[in-house]
Every structure is written in structure tokens, then in C-alpha cells.
Amino acid sequence: MGDWLETDAQKFPHGLKGMVQEIHASGFQAGLWLAPFVCEKDSALFLQHPDWLLKVDGKPWCCGSNWSSFYALDIDNPAVLDYLRRVFDRVLNDWGFDLVKLDFLYGAAPFGNVHESRAARMYRAMELLRSWCGQKTILGCGVPVIPAFGLVDYCRVSCDVSLDWDDVWYMRLFHRERVSTKQAINNTVFRRQLNGRAYGSDPDVFFLREENCKLTAEQKRTLATVNALLGNVFLTSDMPSHYTDAQRAEYRRLRTLFEHATQVQTEAENDRLSIRYLLDGTPQKLCFDLF
């Protein structure tokens, strides 16, 4: 992360612009994942521009342990802003991407100072992103939900889902938040009021696959159904070409829910959640335990 203007010629022999053109020719929009406010310790940016890093007591601020660990960039540094402006110009206007998923955005504002609160700093960072992206679609991720209000098209409202139902205790030593399917569902439920008001809610991905996934069939169905009914983004990390006939049928069921369910209402009572909705004019109800 950090070296966003460099392209691997072996993986992308025709460049990213050529790949985007192929995607558009197939009738799809093209999206790209970026983490603009952080850089990895192994990146050229980290090694060549130590003055671009946000520092505490003279030391770069580490804000995540993924990969080689990553560090926050200082959005008060004009050189950082100029670099990021060039990154988005290249990605959106030269390469032609239609959507960017922007992750680890909290790195712009891990703390405030005497002149600016943390929330104000985060909001300023989000305004910068919108100014750089113009009318292109933004999916925000890893950002406090309030500073993103009205500045992104879609926003993650939950923690990351897990390949198991809940996280193991030692993962909390390495991550700022829980990686938990159970907790992600609760986040999606209790932040449902944001959907369509502050932005479109992204509840993270769902799984239908069997391989590399420890969720039971019931747990996978619950996660996917809640995402379809209460979210505005419908994504899976599965490889759909590997689906069985039964998994394809389940995907079609979920897609129908996502596109056609109406009058969705929720009610929580005694640790049990009920979701009522209409599908083709017929009342439907989903019940599950919250905790």
C-alpha cells in the first residue's frame, strides 16, 4: 500500500487503462481498491518520503498490523495532498475507473490536536476525497460513520465478517476492531437507519461457498439474508463460477430479495430480531437471535 502509481507489468501487461477498457467493453463498470491515507512499511513511499508520515514524538504512527504493517500519512503536509491528488487523477481520469473502494480511512485522523478535533480532521479528510473523486462513485471503508455522512455514495457500516461465526480472543491483540460475522450482522441491524439517508450501507460480503469457510449453512443464510434486506451493497467474496446448482439457486433467491423486497421493517425484543418485508406482495418474516 502506498505506491499507487506503480503497476506490475507482469500482472497487467496492457496496463490498468487497458484492463478498464476491456471491462467497459463487456458492459461492466470498473472499480479499484485503494487505501489513500496509509502506506506499508515495505513501500517505496515509506522508504523515500519519511517526511510524509504522521509522527508522534518523532516516530511514524503505526495504525495497522496487516501485511508489513502500515502507517498514517500526514494530511497537513502539502506534498502528501499533491501526491494523492495525482493518484486520483490517474486512477479516475487517465485509467478510467468508475468506482473506488477507499479503505483504512481512519488513518487520516487517529487523533486530534489543540486546533482541530479528531472528528473535524476526519471530516476534512473525507471532503478532500470527495473533491478529488468528483462525481465518481466512492465506497468508504474503515471510516467512522458520522464524518462520512453525505460525502460517500456507500459506506461500510460493520466490522469485517469472519470465516467463522465469531473471532478468537487473540485476534483482538492485532486489530483495532473485531473480525466477526456475528458482530457484523449486529452492526448492520443497528445501523440500518443510515441506509439511504447518510449513504448506501455496505454490510461487507457474504459467503455461500463451502471451501475455506467454517460457517454453518444456517449462519451463511442468515448473514446473506440480512445483507440483502438491510444493505445497499450486495457483495460476495466467493468465486461464483465454482457454485453448485444449489448455491446458484440460493444466490438467485438472495438477489431477488435485494432487488425486490419492499416495506422492510425490523423489531427487536428479548434478544431476538424480527425482519418483516413484502416480496411480490406476500408478507415474509425472518427471525434470529441477536447475541
Task: Kindly label every feature range from the protein language model.
Residues 224-268:
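Aromatic- and carboxylate-lined catalytic core of secreted/periplasmic carbohydrate-active enzymes
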Residues 16-23, 118-136:
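Alpha-helix-loop-beta-strand connector modules within alpha/beta enzyme cores
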Residues 1-89, 93-112:
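Aromatic-lined carbohydrate-binding/catalytic grooves of carbohydrate-active enzymes
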Residues 108-122:
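Active-site cleft segment of glycoside hydrolase catalytic domains centered on the general acid/base Glu
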Residues 45-82, 130-242:
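Glycan-recognition surfaces
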Residues 43-47, 111-115, 150-152, 249-250:
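Short secondary-structure transition/capping segments
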Residues 221-223, 227-235, 266-291:
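Carbohydrate-binding surface patches
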Residues 27-31, 98-99, 135-137, 233, ...:
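Beta-sheet entry/capping signal
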